[in-house]
Every structure is written in structure tokens, then in C-alpha cells.
Curated annotation (Swiss-Prot):
Transmembrane segments: 68-88, 98-118, 139-159, 186-206, 216-236, 329-349, 374-394, 418-438, 460-480, 496-516, 543-563
Phenotype of the disrupted gene, per the record: Nrt1.11 and nrt1.12 double mutant is defective in high-nitrate-enhanced growth.
Gene Ontology cellular component terms for the protein in this record: plasma membrane
UniProt protein name: Protein NRT1/ PTR FAMILY 1.1
Naturally occurring in which organism (per UniProt): Arabidopsis thaliana (Mouse-ear cress)
Amino acid sequence: MENPPDQTESKETLQQPITRRRTKGGLLTMPFIIANEGFEKVASYGLLQNMILYLMSDYRLGLVKGQTVLFMWVAATNFMPLVGAFLSDSYLGRFLTIVIASLSSLLGMVVLWLTAMLPQVKPSPCVATAGTNCSSATSSQLALLYTAFALISIGSGGIRPCSLAFGADQLDNKENPKNERVLESFFGWYYASSSVAVLIAFTVIVYIQDHLGWKIGFGIPAILMLLAGFLFVFASPLYVKRDVSKSLFTGLAQVVAAAYVKRNLTLPDHHDSRDCYYRLKDSELKAPSDKLRFLNKACAISNRDEDLGSDGLALNQWRLCTTDQVEKLKALVKVIPVWSTGIMMSINVSQNSFQLLQAKSMDRRLSSNSTFQIPAGSFGMFTIIALISWVVLYDRAILPLASKIRGRPVRVNVKIRMGLGLFISFLAMAVSATVEHYRRKTAISQGLANDANSTVSISAMWLVPQYVLHGLAEALTGIGQTEFFYTEFPKSMSSIAASLFGLGMAVANILASVILNAVKNSSKQGNVSWIEDNINKGHYDYYYWVLAILSFVNVIYYVVCSWSYGPTVDQVRNDKVNGMRKEEEEVIKLN
């Protein structure tokens, strides 16, 4: 008997993705995707780490102005992933977005390399002779520099959110009973491999810049970015490329508009509501959830004749939305408080320029008998080493051991991990303040109060604990937040989920700039404040204590947000599994 045309078409549609899943995607694509982001991170982080020194020496910007420029650049770099995620999910698709972004990053790095190669595009060298004033950078010179920063930010905005989601697309398989564990492991190892790239940036690239100069130090990242784009495009035939949906933000705006238009509508009782809400035929949601119930008015059918056409579809999508649209907006609104708690940790991590100046003023030898000095810009490697070590230990030792002891798979709830990371971030700032107090006190006792360029007789290894704590905090909260967003959001919002942590870092850098300037202005006594170009004259220990206090308040804020959020998707699923397991055990006992 011949199938009706619509059933045949449906069967072909179902079979097509299954065939694609067998022939494309999988672990084979991981080296190309991770290599693309890895090389991008080596290039961009390698440029960032020493950039404050480049701005102060070659462009003659003061510490506060130079750091403010870097705060804004990093903020733009971390904000652009939201734009990239929107374009990816709604218009371009993840593959094309990554290709365009790689080209933008490459152009930005070439322009930055040109600022080092061409003397006329930056201030002339400062000659230290009597009566000679050093010229400042002109508007056109700064414009070229900022153009390079902007192109790099645009590139990062397309690569970073899409690479993570694009990689997850290659592995995500709902038919696999271990799908959750595969994705959790993927997120951890993805961050670990990205962190290896950052580690290379903090060591190799920084070393090259310190010893071979800016021309080679900026040229190598450009070459790496070219290699990153080539490798990604080379593997194009192997990728699973999901189709884009309609504009996500348009759909969210329609929910807000429809809910407002029908704000006076009385919602049906819960037990009578199944047929009162508008949904598409292939939707699994028969009715919206009870949380943020006022948004349910957007998908409530008030008058079938006025709201629906003869084909059963909405006549006006700005007045009647689907249940899926409503739940997407709810998912986004619901995570905002939890998302905001990660901002303070990102503010703490963004203080690397001050830590760079601290390291430059200290004894950076590995031991008193050693002649090798760790470059000041390379101390960030201890943060990355701590992050990688935790990922490996957690994934390969802690979880397997706990699962073996309990006799069943064990996972540490993502909300617990995020909270622990925020508390460790508070400890990191408390340690930073204590170490800086000791460093400054030692510098003054050695008569170096007015000489920030001399080395204080104190080992820079005292800075390692705070870097390690920052790494643990980021491993717990950073990876935890990304996993949290990805599992709580619908799959059509994967790139948005991957970009939210970066958006938090963007907001953090803007707030860090505000806090920095506020502390500098409010602490000024005469011509000296807590924030000075000469760190021996300033009081960076007091500044760190301000951040530590804010971090502790943030931990309390997180506890409140976590409690009010309620159970996560994983918690609900695990409760169901545990309930079924208990029922099976009871049946076995009865038999």
C-alpha cells in the first residue's frame, strides 16, 4: 500500500538527519574546531597580556588611561560574542559566522602588526634630552590602533560562541543514553584545550615579545590566525551544519509585545489550559510552564476566529506566539540573576595589568641561584595550569572514584560548583590584598617608594597562590555557568548560551573601569591616590580589599539567586531517575 505524500515526505525528512549524523560530525571534527579557537586564543591573549606595556611605552598612555582602554577593548571583545551568536543562530549559521570572524581577526592582527612595523603610525621615539617634551599619540594614530582592536573584537565575537556550540553540534545525540555525560566531558575538555592555548600565549608569545620585540611579537599571532582559519575551512565537508531558525530576538520581542497587548487577559485554569495555548504541531510543549506566568498571555488563544487562520496558524505573530517562543524568553529571563553573579568574578580576573606591574617589581627568578627570570606577563600561566589541572582531576579522578564508591554515576550539581567558584574568587582577592600589602611595605623599607622600576627583594612566587585561586574559580564558575546555560536553554539558543559568560565578562570590564576610576578619584589625597603609575606610592592593597568585600557580598547574592531559581533541568531529570530506581528496588524487595 502506497504511503500518502505527506507521510512519505515526513519519513524522508526524518531519515535525512539520521544519515547525516552517521556520515558527518563526531570526534573526527574536533581537532579542526578546537584548533581554530585555540590558535585564535593564542593570538588574541598573546597580544593582550603585554599590551599595557605597549600602550605605555610606544603610545605614551598613562597607567589608568591605558588600563581603561584595555578594559574597553576586553569589554568589546566579550560583548561581541552576543552579536555573533545572534547572527549565527538567526541568519548566517555557525560555520559561516566562524569563517567571517576568522577573517576579521586576521585583518585586525595585521593592522596591529603594522603599528609596530611603521614608525609614522605612532608617536616618534622619546629622546631623553633637556628641554625635550615627548609627543603624545595623535587622534589618527589612536584611530588606527583602535581599528585593529575593533577588528580583533569582531573576530573573537564570531569565533568564541560559535566554536563551542558548533563543537557540541558534532557530538550532541539525543539517542545516546550517555549524551549528558558526553557533553559535560566535552565542555570540560574544550575549556582545558582552550586553556592550553592561553597558556602558550602567556608563555611563548609573551617571551617572544619581551626578547624579540613587538614586530615579531605581533607578527606571529597574525600568522597563527591565518593558520586557524585555514584549518577550519579545510575540514568543511566533515561538519554537521544545522539550519538557522528565524530571528531569535524577533521571536522574543514578539512575546513581550503579545504579553503586553493581552495584559488584561485572564489566563485559563491549569487543568483546562491544554487546548487554550497556541503551539505548532511538532512542538513537545502542550502548555507553558507556571513560572513567570504573566508571559503565558502571549501564547493564550483569546478568540480562535480572530487569532487563527483556516490553516490553524497565527494570523498576527505580534499578538499570538507559540508556547516554544514563550519558554525561550522565560529561560533567558530566569537565568539573568544567576548570570549576573559571575560578573564579580570576571572583575577580579580582569586585574591582570596591575598584577603584571607587581610581578615586574619583584624578583622573578625561580630560585636565588637561578639566572632565568619568568617574564612578568607569563605569571598568568599559573591560572591556566590550575584550571587545566582541575578539569583533568575532576573528569578523570574525582568523578570516576565517587561513582565507583557510590555504585552509580555521580555528578556534582552545577549550582554547587558555581557557588564554590565564587567563594574561591573572594579568597583570591583577599590573598592578593595581603601579598600586595607585604610587597609595598618591603619596597618602602628598602627605600624604593619613589622608584617603581627597581626590583624589590621579595620573590614573585608569592603571587602564585592568587593566580592559582583565580584558575580554580574560573574552572568552577566559568565552566559551570557555560554548562548551566547550555542545559537550561533550548538547543536553538545554543550560541546564545555559549556567549552569555563572555557577555558577563564584557559587563565586568566596563564595571571594572568604573570601579577603578571611582577608587582613584575618591581615594585621592593631594596628588596621590590608591591607584598610581608608581605602584609603590599607591595603595593597591586597599583597592584589592574593596574588590574582596564586593566579592563576599556577591557570594551571598549568589546563594539567594540559586535558591530562588529552583531545581535545574539536570536536577529534575536526576530526581526522576532516582525515583524510578527506588521504585525498581521496592519491586525487587517485594518479589
